[in-house]
A protein has these predicted regions:
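Residue-level recognition of the GNAT/N-acetyltransferase active site
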Residues: 110, 188
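Short, low-complexity, charge-dense intrinsically disordered segments
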Residues: 6-9, 18-25, 31
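Conserved active-site alpha-helix within GNAT-family acetyltransferase domains
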Residues: 132, 136, 142-170
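A short helix-loop-beta-strand connector motif used in the catalytic cores of GNAT acetyltransferases and
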Residues: 71-85, 103, 176-179
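Short, P/G- and charge-enriched loop/turn segments at secondary-structure junctions
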Residues: 67-69, 167-173
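Short amphipathic alpha-helix that is part of the acyltransferase structural core
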Residues: 25-66, 83, 180-182, 189-202
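Conserved beta-strand in the GNAT
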Residues: 81, 87-96, 100-108
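Conserved acetyl-CoA-binding loop-helix of GNAT-fold acetyltransferases
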Residues: 109, 115-130, 140
């Protein structure tokens, strides 16, 4: 496992620093905006119902696949979530397709929290975690390819991600008529902070 370090003196600067959300070994937290909300953190099983509700509420937009509550409960710790005033407003799942390829799944930002960069911050954190876990690439299947391209992903033919096809696509009724783009991001392995990642491979 690659390890390394994680991501004075006037009093005002020191006082502001103490108000920031603490970064712990179990989850890297981030804040957005001067009010320090929303906050990004690793999800826990206690978040499963809120994650399920957020995904279900946005399925009608046509960009998400349904996820059962049982599935989310089983994989809750793979999610990164954004919390705004005690309300879960964004999430995404980091799923292992193979020992070398991970996938961004169920990326959704509630309409009330959009245009704040939350989606990009969540994807960046998932990419960081995938890199630490030893994956060589991060992929996604999406209707919004341009969104991912702006984050450094490349559009590729679906067969270039055979792990996804074997894991999910062949069982999909739209397999031969898929309207999604396949995008992929190579992960350069560098110095990263340690985060617990056992759940990604189990």
């Amino acid at each position: 496992m690659r390890t390394a370090t994680a991501f004075t003196g006037v009093r005002p600067a020191r006082r502001r620093a103490t108000k920031r959300t603490k970064i712990t070994k179990n989850s890297r937290l981030a804040t957005v905006g001067r009010s320090q909300t929303p906050v990004l953190r690793a999800a826990t099983p206690a978040d499963a119902h809120a994650i399920h509700a957020l995904i279900t509420a946005h399925i009608r937009e046509g960009h998400l696949l349904p996820r059962s509550l049982e599935d989310i409960e089983a994989h809750a710790t793979r999610f990164i979530v954004a919390i705004d005033r005690d309300r879960l407003v964004a999430c995404a799942d980091l799923a292992a397709l193979s020992p070398l390829v991970a996938e961004v799944r169920s990326l959704v930002v509630d309409e009330s929290a959009r245009s704040k960069g939350l989606g990009q911050q969540i994807v960046n954190e998932l990419a960081r975690r995938a890199r630490v876990a030893g994956f060589d690439s991060l992929c996604a299947f999406t209707h919004s390819a341009g969104y991912f391209v702006r984050m450094g992903f490349s559009i590729v033919p679906h067969p270039w991600i055979p792990e996804k096809i074997e894991a999910d696509c062949r069982a999909c009724p739209l397999f031969r008529q898929c309207g999604q783009y396949a995008v992929t991001l190579p992960l350069a392995h560098g110095v990263e902070s340690f985060v617990p990642l056992a759940s990604l491979h189990g």
